[in-house]
């Protein structure tokens, strides 16, 4: 049985920074390991990533250590997409941005190597993002 890549603290930090930089490179990030409540989880740790939006932790994004870097980055971008537009600093700003002229956010998907941002209307690929590991 393969347990997967087992992400490490430094790798999660790199992926979190990469995702948050897409929203705003000036945002600080807090990252904390989460206690393992599952005694059968042998796949490594997990973390909560908190972008400090509007000067505080407004939401956390869960990352599991057994995920691939692509899945973890997709989760981080999707978590930002779901929550950032509800904050004062990014109110109603579509994230991740879709194609030029579109007012809605791109959808977040993943393939083997990249996070894929797609227009929800056309299905066209807006951007491919490779994890910076």
Task: Enumerate the language-model features and the residues they cover.
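General detector of N-terminal leader/presequence modules that precede the first folded domain
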Residues: 1-36
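Interaction interfaces in information-processing and related assembly proteins
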Residues: 22-75
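Cys/His-clustered metal-coordination modules, chiefly Zn-binding fingers
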Residues: 64-133
């Amino acid at each position: 049985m393969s347990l997967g890549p087992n992400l490490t603290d430094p790798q999660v930090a790199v992926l979190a920074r990469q995702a948050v930089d897409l929203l705003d490179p000036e945002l600080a990030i807090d990252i904390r390991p989460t206690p393992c409540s599952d005694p059968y989880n042998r796949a490594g740790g997990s973390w909560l990533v908190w972008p400090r939006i509007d000067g505080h932790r407004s939401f956390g994004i869960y990352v599991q250590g057994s995920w691939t870097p692509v899945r973890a980055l997709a989760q981080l971008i999707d978590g930002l997409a779901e929550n950032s537009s509800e904050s004062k600093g990014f109110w109603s700003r579509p994230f991740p941005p879709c194609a030029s002229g579109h007012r809605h956010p791109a959808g977040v998907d993943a393939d083997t190597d990249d996070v894929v941002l797609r227009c929800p209307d056309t299905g066209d690929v807006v951007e491919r993002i490779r994890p910076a590991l």
